């Protein structure tokens, strides 16, 4: 069981209690704080769509501390980030690994940040499947297709060549925030909120 802190606000009509994530959402902050799966993706997508309906011009802030997760769920978040009219700013707090790194890189131009001690990791998608040889082959082809898609997404957001991305993602490729900035995954490193 996870404990989610509550925040109490005083208003003219009395007190109002929010869970901390709902309170952050009022400030247009969405927090990805774990593995990416379908449930997490659906919640993040719903929050983005809600914030867009509230004000399509106002920035959305996606804070990321994630080890990555399911590629299709992550791509649903990615596609929504590109779909909404709101500019989306990304900030890595802790780690952005695998699909988390793809989402970090997908923030708006000039709006991708990392904290000083953040860790970023990119790699190729992995998966396991058992069954008949033909089914295993079908799934292997799908993983290769996903790898090409993810490499293309990273190349388009970082400015790196597809060849460099393919080479670097052959194995786990870890970066600190400075290295991620040089690589083009983030635009800047922030030490203090302004």
UniProtKB/Swiss-Prot annotation:
One of its GO terms (molecular function) is serine-type endopeptidase activity. It comes from Syntrophotalea carbinolica (strain DSM 2380 / NBRC 103641 / GraBd1). Coiled coil: none annotated. The gene is clpP. Cleaves peptides in various proteins in a process that requires ATP hydrolysis. Has a chymotrypsin-like activity. Plays a major role in the degradation of misfolded proteins. Fourteen ClpP subunits assemble into 2 heptameric rings which stack back to back to give a disk-like structure with a central cavity, resembling the structure of eukaryotic proteasomes. GO terms for biological process: protein quality control for misfolded or incompletely synthesized proteins. One of its GO terms (cellular component) is endopeptidase Clp complex. It is found in: Cytoplasm. InterPro entries: ClpP (IPR001907), ClpP/crotonase-like_dom_sf (IPR029045), ClpP/TepA (IPR023562), ClpP_His_AS (IPR033135), ClpP_Ser_AS (IPR018215). Signal peptide: none annotated. Keywords: Cytoplasm, Hydrolase, Protease, Serine protease. It is an enzyme of class 3 (hydrolase). The active site is at residues 98, 123. NCBIfam families: clpP, PRK00277.1, PRK12553.1. Pfam families: CLP_protease (PF00574). This is ATP-dependent Clp protease proteolytic subunit. SUPFAM superfamilies: ClpP/crotonase. Its main location: cytoplasm. It catalyses: Hydrolysis of proteins to small peptides in the presence of ATP and magnesium. alpha-casein is the usual test substrate. In the absence of ATP, only oligopeptides shorter than five residues are hydrolyzed (such as succinyl-Leu-Tyr-|-NHMec, and Leu-Tyr-Leu-|-Tyr-Trp, in which cleavage of the -Tyr-|-Leu- and -Tyr-|-Trp bonds also occurs). Its EC number is 3.4.21.92. Belongs to the peptidase S14 family.
């Amino acid at each position: 069981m996870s404990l989610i802190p509550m925040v109490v606000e005083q208003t003219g009509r009395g007190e109002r209690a929010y869970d901390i994530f709902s309170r952050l959402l009022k400030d247009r902050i969405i927090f990805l704080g774990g593995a990416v799966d379908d449930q997490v993706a659906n919640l993040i997508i719903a929050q983005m769509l809600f914030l867009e309906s509230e004000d399509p011009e106002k920035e959305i802030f996606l804070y990321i501390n994630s080890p990555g997760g399911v590629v299709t769920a992550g791509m649903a978040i990615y596609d929504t980030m590109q779909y909404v009219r709101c500019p989306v700013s990304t900030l890595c707090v802790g780690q952005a690994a695998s699909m988390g790194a793809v989402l970090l890189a997908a923030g708006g131009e000039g709006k991708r940040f990392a904290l000083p001690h953040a860790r970023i990791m990119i790699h190729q998608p992995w998966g396991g499947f058992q069954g008949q040889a033909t089914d295993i082959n079908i799934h292997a082809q799908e993983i290769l297709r996903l790898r090409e898609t993810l490499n293309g997404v990273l190349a388009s957001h970082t400015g790196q060549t597809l060849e460099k991305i393919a080479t670097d993602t052959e194995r786990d490729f870890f970066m600190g925030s400075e290295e991620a900035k040089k690589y083009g995954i983030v635009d800047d490193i922030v030490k203090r909120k302004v």
